[in-house]
Amino acid sequence: MPVRQLPETVVNRIAAGEVVERPASVVKELVENAIDAGATRIDVFTDGGGRRRIGVTDDGAGMAKGDLALAVDRHATSKLDDEDLLGIRTLGFRGEALPSIGAVARLCITTREAREPHAWSLTVEGGRKSEIIPAALTNGTRVEVGDLFYATPARLKFLKTDRTEAEAIREVVRRLAMARPDIGFTLAGEERAPVTWTAALPGAAGRLTRLGDILGGDFRAAAIPVRAEREGVIVEGFAAAPSLTRANALGQYLFVNGRPVRDKLILGAVRAAYSDYLPRDRHPVAALFVTADPREVDANVHPAKTEVRFRNAGLVRALIVHALKEGLAREGRRTAANRDGAVLTAFRPAPSPRPANWDWRESPAAPADARPWIGGPPAAAFAEAGQAALDVGAPSADVRFDAHPPLDLVDRPLGAARTQIHETYIVSQTRDGLIVVDQHAAHERIVYERLKTALARDGVQRQILLIPDIVELDEATVEKLIDRATELEKFGLAIESFGPGAVAVRETPSLLGKINAAALLRDLAEHMTEWEETLPLERRLMHVAATMACHGSVRAGRILKPEEMNALLREMEATPNSGQCNHGRPTYVELKLDDIEKLFGRR
């Protein structure tokens, strides 16, 4: 077959395959055009998941009659100066969206510029343009797309259900609404109830309001402001505390110069910043906005414009990690506080079942305050109970009291230890409430931070075992451990092969004290199996530190003396990120006195 020039209609349909993948792609292009036109309000309507109809109306600048005729031609745009691909400041710039949509659907554009006496309307069906005719519309533009892919019916079979396509449209509008909180958005359609996001005030407060409206109240309550700037690059936004996570990375919203993007570099930086806070199977929630000189960012990577390249990618990654780590460290203790009512909900008593005609006066026992104390006043009774609980030899001791904690400790952030319950949780009293601490989770974070500090300095001090521990493992596990022996030695864990299926442990980290070497090695080997070969050395070392910290921490079930409990609280106050353990779980919860009084109906 000889080489020949393809007809314009075929060329447009081929181009549409890159720009218009599904109805959500159409909505994205049209809403971006509205934003570039300076709109302050954008209304989106869909029907049939966008297959039957898509409508986008804005109050932007609109177009004159002559511009409307050119707007549906390929590579015709008002957003790009000649040869200025490096200084792109708009969301659109390729001049492909409208002709691509018109090539595969029925497209109708009605627009009016402020100086025009009336609006103008143009229809494009399957790439064929109609005459421009007068129409009625206030300032702005209305674009209607019907029968999407009617000109290329083979594409229809690749679309999902109406509900799935409608959800994809919703996600596109959500991202664009997050990028521009100063613009009001409405999203309506037969598949959903209308959603309206009113324009927010400028600044961080307005941005958080819009993010909270879209991502929900749990994100608003857990949001930590982050900001960093270096060499003309600004990273700002909000990141959720480690207590709010997702099972996937879909809760991470990234914007570069106002453009929603999916960038592996930024996603990797977010994950790295949270590596000390979250378990491996959980992902953070964040909305980050990167602002840089357009000449330092290449937005012309793909026709869909969802990918970007940075001239100095290392700077951007480092800045994101720094901003997030600084924000997380600054708000470290806030992650464990009672901000969303979860603690109050857990404490609320369930109503006791009682007969309808129940009367307390006919109850076998009188109210507590109507009965005399037997054996002394309440203080004496509690003192005796506390003394019995502090007796380590008592086999049934389940609650340990310190009836008279030092008064000055009550004013400390984590208060004075009052009791240990179930040999797992420390209850402390503060000036305005109480705190419940998970002793293992808290000590795990302390040990982890100590290991990190020691590693950054002169290395972890080690203790030589008089008699090496011989740990029997399968040969594959032994091989994994020996291959990583150099990395383990950095943490004071010296191992060597001891014949087939065994490892000799000759030195252990002093910080961990006496440990179960066999259990530690098995856990380390299991985690090493999950490591990717490309995982950076620093990340691998942090995984080792986290595993060691877990094995070297105070276990649940260990009875603590009052002075030990207070010492743990003081160490928590001096330890960075002490609000959550290495797995992202809270180390303590706080209940304010006001909340306690509400529980008992005093407020």
Swiss-Prot record:
Any Pfam family hit: MutL_C
User: What is any one GO biological process for this UniProt entry?
Assistant: mismatch repair
Keyword Manganese in annotation: no
For this UniProt record, the keywords arranged alphabetically read as follows: DNA damage, DNA repair
Q: Which GO terms describe its molecular function?
A: ATP binding; ATP hydrolysis activity; ATP-dependent DNA damage sensor activity; mismatched DNA binding
Q: Which family does it belong to?
A: Belongs to the DNA mismatch repair MutL/HexB family.
> What is the purpose of this protein?
This protein is involved in the repair of mismatches in DNA. It is required for dam-dependent methyl-directed DNA mismatch repair. May act as a 'molecular matchmaker', a protein that promotes the formation of a stable complex between two or more DNA-binding proteins in an ATP-dependent manner without itself being part of a final effector complex.
This protein is called: DNA mismatch repair protein MutL
Q: Which gene encodes it?
A: mutL
